Amino acid sequence: MYQDLIRGELTEAADTLSRFLQDDANIEAIQKAAVLLADSFKAGGKVLSCGNGGSHCDAMHFAEELTGRYRENRPGYPAIAISDVSHISCVSNDFGYEYVFSRYVEAVGKEGDVLLGISTSGNSGNIIKAISAAREKGMKVITLTGKDGGKMAGSADIEIRVPHFGYADRIQEIHIKVIHILIQLIEKEMEK
């Protein structure tokens, strides 16, 4: 009954991944991001991650697998997803939703830390403000974006962009793969 739809969805997902893999710059950016994160951890820094909607879940997933575990047991790494409901509701109410991430970065970010901003469109105003706040703190910035990178294009030290112009879910599927690879590479770097 739905076999053609199922095959079509899986084929589109595979094609999106294949196109992403064909650009060596993506592979290089993932490696550089992992080394940047591990270097921050080794120097006493941390990563703050943020996103909206499904990307918010990805930001939480990233932090959870760094502080908890990925595939193997190892020490936890310093990662915070900006996801505290009381913070988000307070800042949204008192300042506006566009400040929910930047206020947190202003409060706990420091030089040597890293901000990971995740936005499938690259146009999330609250992440753009978080990037500005991170820059003011002397933090490094990594972004996971999609399409043409949107307004966030060129704003990060390292941008990992999925150039898919369809629905956001295809971009998110690549983002979660990138997140898992980042964690795997961070673990290898931390063993050095």
Curated annotation (Swiss-Prot):
It is found in: Cytoplasm. Binds 1 zinc ion per subunit. SUPFAM superfamilies: SIS domain (SSF53697). It catalyses: 2 D-sedoheptulose 7-phosphate = D-glycero-alpha-D-manno-heptose 7-phosphate + D-glycero-beta-D-manno-heptose 7-phosphate. PANTHER family: PHOSPHOHEPTOSE ISOMERASE, SEDOHEPTULOSE 7-PHOSPHATE ISOMERASE / DNAA INITIATOR-ASSOCIATING FACTOR FOR REPLICATION INITIATION. This is Phosphoheptose isomerase. The reaction produces a racemic mixture of D-glycero-alpha-D-manno-heptose 7-phosphate and D-glycero-beta-D-manno-heptose 7-phosphate. GO terms for cellular component: cytoplasm. Belongs to the SIS family. GmhA subfamily. Homotetramer. Residues 37-192 form the SIS domain.
